[in-house]
């Protein structure tokens, strides 16, 4: 299913070669942060579904830091980050009130 991407031509200029090197590093860093973001959100959702109030609150606090970092770096849009935080906050609060 995963098709190989066509190989790009190597840049001639030194600045172009440097840009390619930088892009590889930046892409790896962004991929890692994107994954960390999604994992943090999933952890909160799992805790909410399990009905564990203390774990959900703890995971939500950790998730907020990750979400803010990713939004500040521009990997995800700040509105998406705010939307995710708002929705998860509502779920955690509903869990706290229900218990």
UniProtKB/Swiss-Prot annotation:
GO terms for molecular function: small ribosomal subunit rRNA binding; structural constituent of ribosome. The keyword Glycoprotein does not apply. Pfam families: Ribosomal_S20p. The keyword Ribosomal protein applies. Residues 1-21 are annotated as: Disordered. Keywords: Ribonucleoprotein, Ribosomal protein, RNA-binding, rRNA-binding. This is Small ribosomal subunit protein bS20. It comes from Verminephrobacter eiseniae (strain EF01-2). The gene is rpsT.
């Amino acid at each position: 299913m995963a098709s190989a991407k066509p190989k790009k031509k190597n840049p001639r200029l030194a600045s172009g070669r440097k840009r390619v090197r930088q892009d590889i590093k930046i892409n790896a860093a962004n991929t890692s942060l994107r994954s960390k973001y999604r994992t943090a959100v999933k952890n909160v959702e799992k805790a909410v579904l399990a009905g564990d109030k203390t774990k959900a609150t703890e995971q939500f606090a950790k998730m907020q830091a990750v979400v803010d970092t990713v939004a500040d770096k521009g990997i995800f849009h700040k509105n998406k980050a705010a939307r995710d935080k708002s929705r998860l906050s509502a779920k955690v609060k509903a869990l706290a009130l229900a218990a």
